Curated annotation (Swiss-Prot):
This is Phylloseptin-B1. It comes from Phyllomedusa bicolor. It is found in: Secreted; Target cell membrane. Pfam families: FSAP_sig_propep. The keyword Lipid metabolism does not apply. Antimicrobial peptide with activity against only a few strains of Gram-positive bacteria (S.aureus and B.megaterium). Acts in a synergistic effect in combination with Plasticin-B1 at doses that are not active alone. GO terms for cellular component: extracellular region; membrane; other organism cell membrane.
Length: 66
């Protein structure tokens, strides 16, 4: 009976350890995806902030040529 009890505890312990490792990997993956999404948004904001400068430059060039 003691052998069965020890074996059961060992199986439960190893199961909990593997579950913990899987949860940690899942959390890391979600963090990487979130960080990548934030990087994409910041790049988009930088590009959108350049549009007024580009438009004014094109307008000045058109005024100079025309």
């Amino acid at each position: 009976m003691a052998f069965l009890k020890k074996s059961l505890f060992l199986v439960l312990f190893l199961g909990l350890v593997s579950l913990s490792i899987c949860e940690e990997e899942k959390r890391e993956t979600e963090e990487k995806e979130y960080d990548q999404g934030e990087d994409d948004k910041s790049e988009e904001k930088r590009f959108l902030s350049l549009i007024p400068h580009i438009v004014s430059g094109v307008a000045a060039l058109a005024k100079h040529l025309g």
